[in-house]
Amino acid sequence: YMPEKGLTYRSEVMSFLGAQLYERFRSPELRSLVDHFSRQKDAPPQVSAMVRRVESNYIYINKIPQAEYQAYIALIAKAEQVWEQAREANDFQRFAPYLERIVDTLRAFAGYWGYKAEPYDALMSFYEPGTTVQQMDRLADELKHFVIDLFQTLQARGMPCGEPAEGRFRLPLEEQRALSQYVLETIGFDFASGRLDEGPHPTTLAASPGDVRVITSYQAEDFRSGLFNTLHEGGMGLYEQDIDPALLGMLLGEVASFATELAEARLYENIIGRSAGFWEYLFPRMQQLCPSLAVDERETLFQSVNQVRPTLIRNNADELTYILHILIRYEVEKDLMV
């Protein structure tokens, strides 16, 4: 974590580095190199892909005024730390001014980049190239109706389990840490090329395939939250560790897209982590690692992680209603860009 007094200087350094990157991407030399290699019809596919990536970055950066680009880099560096403090204090107003400035900046960037139909198209194209708001609206509408209809059907049939008894899924943090370590080892995460840490919010950080940091978070009163956080981020970590090291230094040694990375995370979290086979495998070892576990039947745990019970917290959402959290965020982001 970043010590509070280190925040200001860190933001200044990131702004400086952003300026260096900006100047390099605006240089005539880079434009000349891109043009040269774009004409090489017999170039290896990795080189052609790298040239396309460099040209895309060149176009995006060159449309933004340098002062605004530097200010944005400094803003997001500071905003992340303020968000962490606001979250800890449960004080949204502390973070609100930073969020407002970020949204205003992205609106301006969308104007610089240009769009055909909606401002959010500019950001969609940046984060998921080739995707449009029109496509996403159609997909979101189909998903929304499917999820809500299925949820209502499940409600009518009655949930497979009632509300859990208070304290039933409580586990000491040390036992949860041991469980998360074991689960990552089980799915193939290479601890010689990564590590498991704790933070205020689950995430995965990767400097290279040989340095992948899975960051999880735990709830003492319900071990399932930490377990599925770890499976989710572990899926991302495996993706990062499987990137070909030969692509490093070519702007290609990173995830292909946010959607691809999240699909890997959801695969391990849900398709594997909520399967009967997974719990048949995990439960005996879990009983050894977690002597405080109050649940003595594998089937009870298996059913508990497959219940559908809406929650306001996305990280604690079940497999079905999690999708609604994503759809709501999509609609909010789209509206903010107008």
Language-model region placement:
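Acidic/polar loop patches that form or flank catalytic/metal-binding clefts of enzymes
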Residues: 192-193, 246-250, 273-284
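Active-site recognition of the HExxH zinc-binding catalytic motif
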Residues: 114, 214, 218-248, 262-269
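Long, amphipathic alpha-helical stalk/connector segments used for oligomerization, subunit docking
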Residues: 274-338
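Hydrophobic/aromatic-lined pockets within catalytic cores
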Residues: 128, 148, 152-155, 159, ...
